[in-house]
Amino acid sequence: MIFFNEEKLIKKLDKTRLPQHVGIIMDGNGRWAQKRGMPRVYGHKAGVNAVREVIRSCRELGIKYLTLYAFSTENWKRPKEEVDFLMDLLVEYLSKEVDELNKNNVVVKFIGDISRLPEKCQIEIEKAQKLTEKNTGLVVNIALNYGGRDEIVKATQNICKKVLNRELSPEDITEDTITQHLYTASQPDPDLIIRTSGEKRLSNFLLWQSAYSELWFTEVLWPDFKKRHLIEALLYYQTRKRRFGGV
């Protein structure tokens, strides 16, 4: 019945009006586990299945860019045991999934301050990016140790260095200058941002890039997020008239 409903929903989609870039704030892993009387870390493990499904669904539907908010600059405040588990889970996910992603022509990129992550994570990240860099299909950005404010600060610092080195004049700095110094330089801004778990805020996610993004919030907890929920978000997106500040 679920697959039948998915097919009915897909038929409603206008394939000519799909977003190029979808961003997802993957929220609710801990609550998913707690509702089942399990430690929070089990929710993170269950969330990997949702990551796998949403990547497959975006490929099938023809989405070109997908950005997943996996670990924020603020998440270091969580208990050490939980942070350590998340880092181990990242290594496990990449070691198991990257060959399949590569086979499916997916480009894997990581955005955020990767230098602060454990060395074992950095090694797997480097392997994944190198293996998939020449692919031409869906681009998956995984935001790790990422914060929108931090990204803007780092972009500003790099621009200031260019001004000091006389590579750039202050008068020539434009919005596009800042855009080209962000982690997502050369990619389109997200057309649609999805947040699971019922929370209704951006939580420091793609702050510069989301200026004109459509926002879709769902009560569904991340481990329960399926293809049909993604299609519901896309159908909502297609009801919106995007004016970008115009009439």
From Swiss-Prot:
Record carries keyword Manganese: no
Cofactor requirement: Mg(2+)
Cofactor note: Binds 2 magnesium ions per subunit.
This protein's encoding gene: uppS
Record-linked SUPFAM superfamilies: Undecaprenyl diphosphate synthase
Originating organism: Caldanaerobacter subterraneus subsp. tengcongensis (strain DSM 15242 / JCM 11007 / NBRC 100824 / MB4) (Thermoanaerobacter tengcongensis)
Listed name of the protein: Isoprenyl transferase
Broadest EC class assigned to this enzyme: transferase
GO cellular component, one term: cytosol
Position of the signal peptide: none
CDD domains linked to this entry: Cis_IPPS
